[in-house]
Amino acid sequence: KISNKTQIINDPLAVRNMPEKLYSIDFLKLMPPTIFTRSVHEIEKFKKKYKKLVIKPTHGYGGKNILFINKSSSRAKISKYLNKHHHVMAQKFLPQIKDGDKRIFIIGGIIKGAIKRIPKKGSIVSNIGQGGKAVKTTLTKNEYRIAKVVASDLKKKHIIFAGIDLISNYL
């Protein structure tokens, strides 16, 4: 406890040791094609293969500093981004994001609920803090299966309260 009035839910060491983007490395089979890198060359190769990518800082959160690139994006643009953010996660862009993602809430290893987050018009970022809109949703059997796999692992690692995001059956 920080004070008599503040209770800490998640183990602080577990939170420190598991930044959300890096934690996902254990679940690459559930994700769209993804690389973790600080190399412009690696991102260029990845871009050549997948044409459209989203790049996120490995320690980013809240839908901030997300970069969309396509085949016409310059090497200089990527380099400038890497100079600012260093280590990044690059993923094949999923156009289904225009229809939103699902934020799934997990407490004590149990799936407690979900919301669908819809990006504001013209955006690929669905986070509510970045202008996204929350709407009621349910999970498909496959979404539930994916969430269950992650929920079980989070419980083993002493993360009591967490949210995970799915876009079109991908973590």
Residue ranges with predicted function:
Residues 54, 105, 167-170:
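Conserved protein-kinase catalytic-loop segment immediately C-terminal to the catalytic Asp
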Residues 7-11, 36, 54-56, 89, ...:
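A structural signal for short, well-ordered beta-strand segments and their strand-loop junctions
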Residues 1-42:
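Conserved N-proximal alpha/beta basic substrate-recognition cap immediately N-terminal to
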Residues 40-41, 48-52, 59-146, 154:
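Phosphate-binding site of ATP-dependent enzymes
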Residues 6-7, 29-32, 51-52, 86-88, ...:
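A structural micro-motif
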Residues 12-16, 117-120, 167-170:
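Short glycine-enriched loops at secondary-structure junctions
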